[in-house]
Amino acid sequence: NMGAATKQGPHARAYRAGSPMSPTGCQTCHGDTKAALGCEGCHGAGKAHVDAGGDKTKIRRFEKMSASEASAVCSSCHSKSSHAMWGGSQHDQRNVGCTSCHDVHAPKGDNLLKAASETALCATCHRTIVNKQLKFNHMPVREGKMTCASCHNVHGAANVKLLRTGGTIFESCVSCHAEKRGPMLWEHFPVTENCATCH
């Protein structure tokens, strides 16, 4: 409770101690805040927040930011390898941002996901596709041997389907299932277009 404790309480003590607003000071009220990163790494400088008695309008609040603004903060650290193509990706263009899927303070799954599993998270927007994948009992997705990210880079790719390998679904599938590429005794034409039509 910050209340009228403008120059008192944990915020003031942490600040007056002469140290920068450290995660240790923030944890007094806010619990575990990923101490290795520090609060200010994401939330910005804390002096005005502390001086105003914990006024929430004086600190960067992700719930008040647009998806692109929040993603810009995250991208200041997470811009390498799998996140390199985020800008302009299908998700970025649809106003989906880092905080649409991830929750640093109260994750429900691995990788700070807002859902218990990756498949459940993807299903919040892609229910029809996930249901189709789960419908086939031979699908490794249903058996938990694959996730959406086994084939898709949700953080951006050079193709519209966000595929990790190849530019089409067929190319992506045969990158693991080379025996299905053909030629075959009787050609199976749909497979050369899109394995996902049936599978």
Question: Where are these predicted regions, by residue range?
Answer:
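Short sequence/structural segments immediately N-terminal
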Residues: 1-197
